[in-house]
């Protein structure tokens, strides 16, 4: 995915599910989740092993969310990503972001075939911060 294709994904998304979130300080999933909340996104933590993260209810899976999120950000090992994408397809999520360092060609193809916008092996925090620096996205995500 090219940089110009990333901007609309971030601008059009208001609700974001973070799959594989950790409640441990310093973990990338928690840092990214906090950053996204601080920039105006409504974030839904997803991890079947946690009941809450940073005073926010945590959901066991995508189908348990109270809304269909605009975007799912995945922090899972590559072998788990296809199952997350299958669930996202089943719940009609329109956009998938497979976080930096995670590569699953199977999941990427699956998302594309389902008509989803998909980003893989890029950090959503870094990409958002770059667009803020460039003045292309407002800091508060209006």
Each predicted region: which residue ranges?
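Short N-terminal or domain-adjacent regulatory/targeting segments
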Residues: 1-12
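NAD(P)-binding Rossmann-fold cofactor-contacting core
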Residues: 22-27, 34-54
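A charged, well-structured terminal subsegment
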Residues: 127-142
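Rossmann-fold NAD(P)-binding glycine/threonine-rich loop
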Residues: 100-126
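Mid-chain, well-packed structural core segment of small domains
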Residues: 62, 66-102
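A short helix->loop->beta-strand "cap" motif at the edges of active sites that frequently abuts
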Residues: 39-41, 91-96, 114-116
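Conserved beta-strand elements of the Class I
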Residues: 17-19
């Amino acid at each position: 995915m090219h940089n110009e294709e990333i901007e609309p994904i971030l601008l059009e998304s208001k609700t974001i599910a973070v799959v594989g979130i950790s409640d441990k300080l310093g973990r990338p999933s928690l840092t990214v989740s906090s950053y996204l909340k601080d920039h105006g996104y409504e974030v839904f933590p997803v991890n079947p092993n946690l009941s809450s993260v940073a005073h926010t209810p945590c959901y066991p899976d995508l189908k348990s969310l109270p809304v269909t999120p605009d975007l799912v950000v995945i922090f899972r090992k590559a072998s788990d990503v296809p199952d997350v994408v299958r669930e996202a397809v089943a719940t009609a999520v329109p956009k998938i972001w497979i976080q930096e360092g995670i590569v699953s060609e199977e999941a990427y193809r699956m998302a594309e075939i389902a008509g989803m916008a998909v980003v893989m092996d890029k950090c959503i925090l870094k990409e958002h911060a770059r667009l803020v620096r460039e003045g292309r996205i407002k800091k508060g995500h209006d």
